[in-house]
Amino acid sequence: MGPLGRETWAQRLGTFRASPSAFMAGPEGEDLGRDLLSDLRSEKLSEPMKVALLALSLEYPDQLWPDAPAAEAAATSLLDTLVLLPPRPSALRRPLLLAATTALAAGGALNPASGASGRLLPLLLGLASGRDLGRSFCPASEQRPLQATAWECLRELESCRPGLLGGCLGLLRALLGREGPAQPLSLLLALALRNALVIQARAGAGLQGLLTAGESSMEGGPWNWMLAEEGEVHLQPQAPSWPAAEEDECGLAALELSPEEARELRATVAQLLDASYLLTPVAQAQLLWLLGWALRGLRGQPPVLFKPQLVRLLGTAQLTLLHAMLALKAAFGEALFTAQDEALLLRRLTLAAQHPALPLPTHLFYLHCLLNFPENWPLGPTGEEAAPLLLGSQLCRGLLPSLLHEPMALLARLHLLCLLCVEDEEKEGKGQDRSPRHYLEELLAGLRQRAALDGGPRALATLCFQASYLVAHCLAGQPVVLIPLTQGLAQLYRARPALAPHFVDLLDHVGPELQEPLRVALRQEVASRPGREEALRWHLQMLASVADGDAQSATLSFLRAAAAHCTDWGLQQALLRVCRALLRAGVGGGLADLLQELARQLEDPDGQDHARLYYILLAHLAGPKLGVALGPSLAAPALASSLVAENQGFAAALMVQEAPAPIRLSVGPRRAEGAVPVLRLQVEVLEPVYSLELRFRVEGQLYAPLGAVHVPCLCPGRPTRPLLLPLQPRRPAPARLAVRALYSTPSGLTCHAHLPPLLVAFADLFLPFPQPPEGAQLDFFEELWDSCLPKGTESRLWCPLGPEGLEALVSRHLEPFVVVAQPPVSYLVAIRLPPDSRLLLRLEAAQADGVPVALRTDDWAVLPLAGDYLRGLSAAG
């Protein structure tokens, strides 16, 4: 097949980028790499298109060259294409060099036996050293850009095979002196130096003249494959943290350097540092990190070499350089930073973090630096979290958290406040006004007050519990803080029981200092307040988490009172989960009576079976065996008896098991008819399902409880009628329906599964008004229009139209609700919104791109929903 055209390649590249894995698995995937390499030599494709093809090979080398032989062949072809380029200027030389390097590195083909490696490495070194390769290879105008690209390629290869350029250190050092402070060359030399030091230290050898060896003294070429084999562990040039001190002691500290090698090493580091100010901030930070790691723990190499850089960097506004400076401080401590330097740096971080115009990421960075500030002489055990000694409450007064801050900034400031509370514990005992602890208690009270708002955003509740966890983690040893925190959380649950899932999650993650008193407080709160019926499921969920052997009589009394209100399957299961928790806690006689009552009282057969099972287990098993029977199941042991196997299978058949749902449920097209809105549900199954029961729960209190939908049998491939789900909105607003399915399988098992939630849109609630008599439509609409005021509200907006115009839009979305129509420019629309609201629309004087809409409603809450609906009609099509 001949070369592909530009349009064909553009289509293939677009399809590939949309889903690389799917494209490579298709019929064209196998030929993509071969066609790419072939068409790079075609004269029919323009250079920009060829550059796009090379960019693809740089982004997805793993998909194009999945193994070492394919990568070797690709690199060879790319080098051949590079050599065959005409001597005129071309935009392909640099991408070809990068693509060949990427293919070898990503495909694992970089080794001494690779022919492509043997061709690429001398070429890169020749370009990097500025050697004249002849005008037939490239014009003089491209030599400087190609030299910078060669440096980048060599740095990539050194990153992939640490130690590969160990034999080139002397050459790179001489080249740096000749070329000046070129950024890629400086980073290449620093990386190669760091890797050589680490690998030689692990081998217990010195530098062996690597820093002074020139190109002429290299035997067998400049590539140190032996050193690269010893450095098989890929050292990351931008690791997020310094090596541990133990690694240094058994690593770089073991490197034996002769006086001449130590002198040459200091000269090389000084040469790199002296010109580092000419590099970009990111490159400077990387250079400092590499050299700091190279010298940390190395005997005979004083960190004073970095001192001139500190004088320059202490006043920097670049975050990357500030981070590198803190990394140097963590590495060398008081050997490099005096107490005055530490105080200056700490004060600068504190003042910078208080700047009101800082973006949130920058503000969080400064706070992170303060929270993890590396002190010269930290007090306390290693690894213990504490505020810096010089960071007092007066200096941090502007960093105290406030309810007005962003959540992430508030939590970071709260973390700092907790550390200050630990430091200022002694001062609080002396009657200090407005101590950090008092401020902390006021802040937590404000967070709880916002979280207690009924119907408030979930983010406020989440923030409150995140802050509570942070305080419990940082101040676990201070009862003076934990006692009011426990009381405040109990009051929060009393005000808003719907936060029970947050409380359960908090109890699972906090330590015993807060966990035990909070469990007791919440158990007392639940037992003393049975609550209304809608809060009962939250009380039962909380009690299942906090119930234990204490306060048995109060807990059992609450359960007996709650059993009368557990009328549906979900509440009954929640009640039985509490009984299971009490069983595991070893509660005895009173629980047996309760289980017998539940076996007679519960209406659902599944609940009755569970109650009888728990009663039998309680009556026949001792405490340890009962805990094992009710605990999480381990790997199933081999069954030695067929009777045991049969009994286990019988028990499994009686239990309702959770399983992945073989059911797909979706909302079908709506029909505006009847007295209440009805969702038409489309259901599909992947396997036969019998006695299907779909249970729906509305998130929030927007709708009245929904009834279950029953289907006797569903089989895959058979058409099914839509399932009708009547809705009873308490307010005309969209909602999410949580869906749970209970069904039987062909094997006789009863299973339950959670289905994806269904969304009830605002338009799903639309109902038409009764049809007025013929000829009275306009009077009927005007009467409705006038009746909306003064109780309701009126608004006007612009509704954009698609290319089909107003008549098509009304026909598609508003046809059942049109009272008066004068197509194609004017329509009067009346919509009834349950339970007792109305929405009236005047669409008049339509223009080509839109129509002005006047709307009235007798319910203020409907106005923003109606505006969003009308503005989205043209996009809905």
UniProtKB/Swiss-Prot annotation:
Signal peptide: none
Recorded GO CC terms: AP-type membrane coat adaptor complex
Any Gene Ontology biological process: protein transport
Pfam families: AP5B1_barrel, AP5B1_C, AP5B1_middle, AP5B1_N
InterPro entries: AP5B1, AP5B1_barrel, AP5B1_C, AP5B1_middle, AP5B1_N
Keyword GTP-binding: no
Record's keyword annotation contains Hydrolase: no
Keywords of the record: Protein transport, Transport
Primary role: As part of AP-5, a probable fifth adaptor protein complex, it may be involved in endosomal transport.
Self-association and partners: Probably part of the adaptor protein complex 5 (AP-5), a tetramer composed of AP5B1, AP5M1, AP5S1 and AP5Z1. Interacts with ZFYVE26 and SPG11.
Name of the protein this chain belongs to: AP-5 complex subunit beta-1
Organism: Bos taurus (Bovine)
Gene name, Swiss-Prot/TrEMBL: AP5B1
